[in-house]
Amino acid sequence: MRGLTPKNGVHIETGPDTESSADSSNFSTGFSGKIRKPRSKVSKACDNCRKRKIKCNGKFPCASCEIYSCECTFSTRQGGARIKNLHKTSLEGTTVQVKEETDSSSTSFSNPQRCTDGPCAVEQPTKFFENFKLGGRSSGDNSGSDGKNDDDVNRNGFYEDDSESQATLTSLQTTLKNLKEMAHLGTHVTSAIESIELQISDLLKRWEPKVRTKELATTKFYPNKSIETQLMKNKYCDVVHLTRYAAWSNNKKDQDTSSQPLIDEIFGLYSPFQFLSLQGIGKCFQNYRSKSKCEIFPRTAKETIYIMLRFFDVCFHHINQGCVSIANPLENYLQKMNLLPSTPSSISSAGSPNTAHTKSHVALVINHLPQPFVRNITGISNSELLSEMNNDISMFGILLKMLDMHKNSYQNFLMEITSNPSVAKNTQSIDVLQEFIHYCQAGEALIALCYSYYNSTLYNYVDFTCDITHLEQLLYFLDLLFWLSEIYGFEKVLNVAVHFVSRVGLSRWEFYVGLDENFAERRRNLWWKAFYFEKTLASKLGYPSNIDDSKINCLLPKNFRDVGFLDNRDFIENVHLVRRSEAFDNMCISDLKYYGELAVLQIVSHFSSSVLFNEKFTSIRNTSKPSVVREKLLFEVLEIFNETEMKYDAIKEQTGKLFDIAFSKDSTELKVSREDKIMASKFVLFYEHHFCRMVNESDNIVARLCVHRRPSILIENLKIYLHKIYKSWTDMNKILLDFDNDYSVYRSFAHYSISCIILVSQAFSVAEFIKVNDVVNMIRVFKRFLDIKIFSENETNEHVFNSQSFKDYTRAFSFLTIVTRIMLLAYGESSSTNLDVISKYIDENAPDLKGIIELVLDTNSCAYRFLLEPVQKSGFHLTVSQMLKNRKFQEPLMSNEDNKQMKHNSGKNLNPDLPSLKTGTSCLLNGIESPQLPFNGRSAPSPVRNNSLPEFAQLPSFRSLSVSDMINPDYAQPTNGQNNTQVQSNKPINAQQQIPTSVQVPFMNTNEINNNNNNNNNNKNNINNINNNNSNNFSATSFNLGTLDEFVNNGDLEDLYSILWSDVYPDS
């Protein structure tokens, strides 16, 4: 007879018949101190079968409980009564032994260790262990029986049976519960309780499901699916969450038809922008359906879904342009400027950096620089550039310095013309407009040249052990790319830089021995700058970092060493022990800002490796662990997060000088300059930004581990952190509104947007405690963006329209419009406050914001112009309008009456007014009323080409879309409707964002392009015939989203949901 013997001497033993979980969960206790197994007749019946007075088969769970879909429990009736009568002296030397069949057990145990858990930061339930049962499908959104018999070995998928481990745990839980129910807990009973709790804790720690590996090749629960997908099947939960928005349902057959991964690789595992992905939009849709009391979806809901979908048409088109910019920078720039034929050379500048062909392009771009403007701000003329053009390394360094000087001058220019109050230059003056155009023109030319020479330097050998100048150039370039929001190019250059700095040993102290200290400090600074950029990108994209912190042992920069931190490990372990001191306050603002940012990223990186990508919390085997095991992991996550937050708060205290400056109303009292005030404010935004990110990332881990019924403590913690995000958001609003220029508000939006998106994803919960003043501040931030008129006033100029700064501004403005709209709608619905009342309140108390609410809520207003104008599609979306027009697709989804109604309305132009708002709300800009679509004299643009796209017999589900298709550029379909009036655009033809055909080869199916072009030459009837005959030649994602009017008036959101998201979000 074997058993588990803890160190305190209490030993639990059972009889030889513990194979049955029912047998092992019922005990009778004699006065001798031994706990004996009761008669088999009693132990065969579970509690529910006893109540129903039906026969129980004694299995766990029993067949009757599975049929009734109820929890199967075996309580101790006789044993419980007898334990209460035990004399406390009779427990002396008590031994209770639990049989272990380690040879046949399905649970593999690592080396047993005694529980050494210290006091948790998160208070755990007092009856944690005894409150959980292990029966059936206890976790997941769709809990319930799968209707299979217990004897079915496939019920647990490829995981080995763990009934004996369940029996052991159930026995310990039952005994623990009975001991705690005793009227008087003496010393010996308390000791027994502690012993059993130790055994339970040890068992839960060592619970590791085993996989029947040999059967993976022969058995398939989901045909044609990956092994990872097969391992989702288990007996504990029907729904397996990988993120908050991505869930796999073992009962959802629709998922079997998809060949795409559940996790969208574009958004990664932990990106907060998952909310705006198709999965996130579907989750938002589901939440709205569950919370809305309307039988039909109001127009505002349809409009919101449309603009959220449309947002990615713009974003992914910009991503495609970034891919082209770094691959063929010179050709791409010259074509946009109409200086080259429309068909580019097949020779890439990256592939032949020193050819006469490439150098001739370099000369063309240099001669296209606006002079003497560039010489005035950089001090370098075209002739100087032409004389150095054959020296790649030298030319690369010169161009980087020019781009940096251009950046600083451009920022000062925009800060001056957007200063608040209105003492700025007149943005309509000819001189100001010409200067702005020159900045845009010069910036695009310089970045094209930098990309070209960066590609050239990849082919040069550099001995980095003696000369780190080129490494410094790469990090310099990364800083500029980050400022330009060139994310695609930034990622490519970063990969090269991290490879170089790692290869030459900058992260290891061993490579510094024997070096001159000044040279060694340069190397350290290079490493930590590369660390800064890499960790920032990993956090932004939600991917695991390429830098392993455990292998970093070089010293920290001088500022860290001056305050007592030698290396990364020293900092992580002791940061919370160091208080604010003169050593911090004596740092200059820029040094303290860099210290704070690098400190934050080290904490964030440590949290990522210890939780987000820790195998303990993300193992695929966790899907087949009982709820009590996963709940224990949940509390460990909360404990680690609380420890991380304590260290994070220490950084806030150490950098308190920056917080004091950022929140000060009068910076002159602190004797700081305008630049220092802006730097301090941006650090506070950076700090709050990463705190919100960590909370959001933790939410995804919680979704993975969460059981069906969340513990009250977990719910309380989630509410606390939601309030903290709300507090961060309100603080960020104050800082943004305190900037003295609108340009700084716009440039800080990257940090502000994270808190916005997290709050919007929890809009219905947050709206319950949001205040009217918060609504007003949010609208003020939107107004600050709206006041930056220089971009929209000059977008008809090709240099402005093609500039990266224009694209970045339009994305930020469109995104802010969307989140402001959602927050307003959620606030109005949750607070039962009519938005007209809020609008009236603002008119009376904040007259400078008059008309802004109407502007945001009216999708016909100029606020949505960048989203609603026809653009080249990314291929990310599907044409809902064509879905509804296609009879072959409609008939399976809609009833006969619905089909008749659709046919009746197909020829009508439906255009209902927006409830309680005037359609076509005018834009009020500083009191000047401008037409709704012709914004500042500019008509709505026409589509890029008048292509007709094919109609398809059916629309694929979301996960039948391939990622390569999602980012493919395509041409927009001509659309009609109020929001897309087909008027000849004032925009130059070369400003229509056309991407050369040969450049699209890696991203696009050329057959599809040829088919589209051929179809373009036929009349409408011929087009339809060709489309019907050759539909297989087109990608199923070659749809355009259509116009807003078509979507709102003809769209059926239930049909849309059933097609796009029914296989992503199982029905609750």
Swiss-Prot record:
Keywords noted in UniProt: Activator, DNA-binding, Metal-binding, Nucleus, Phosphoprotein, Transcription, Transcription regulation, Zinc
CDD domains hit by this protein: fungal_TF_MHR, GAL4
DNA bind region: 46-72
SMART domains: Fungal_trans, GAL4
UniProt GO cellular component terms: cytosol; nucleus
Intervals of motif 9aaTAD: 1054-1062
Chain segments carrying region Disordered: 1-38, 95-120, 133-166, 1005-1029
Annotated GO MF terms: DNA-binding transcription activator activity, RNA polymerase II-specific; DNA-binding transcription factor activity, RNA polymerase II-specific; sequence-specific DNA binding; zinc ion binding
Low complexity bias: start-end ranges: 135-146
Residues recorded as bearing Phosphoserine in the entry: S21, S930, S942, S948
Compositionally skewed regions (Polar residues) per UniProt: 17-31, 104-114
Localization (cell): Nucleus
Domain of life: Eukaryota
Record Pfam families: Fungal_trans, Zn_clus
InterPro entries: AtrR-like, Transcription_factor_dom_fun, Zn2-C6_fun-type_DNA-bd_sf, Zn2Cys6_DnaBD
BP terms from Gene Ontology: cellular response to xenobiotic stimulus; DNA-templated transcription; positive regulation of cellular response to drug; positive regulation of transcription by RNA polymerase II
Classification via SUPFAM superfamilies: Zn2/Cys6 DNA-binding domain (SSF57701)
Leftover remarks: Present with 1300 molecules/cell in log phase SD medium.
Domain text: The 9aaTAD motif (residues 1054 to 1062) is a transactivation domain present in a large number of yeast and animal transcription factors.
Biological role stated in the UniProt entry: Positive regulator of proteins involved in permeability. PDR1 and PDR3 jointly control the transcription level of both SNQ2 and PDR5.
Name of protein: Transcription factor PDR1
Name of encoding gene: PDR1
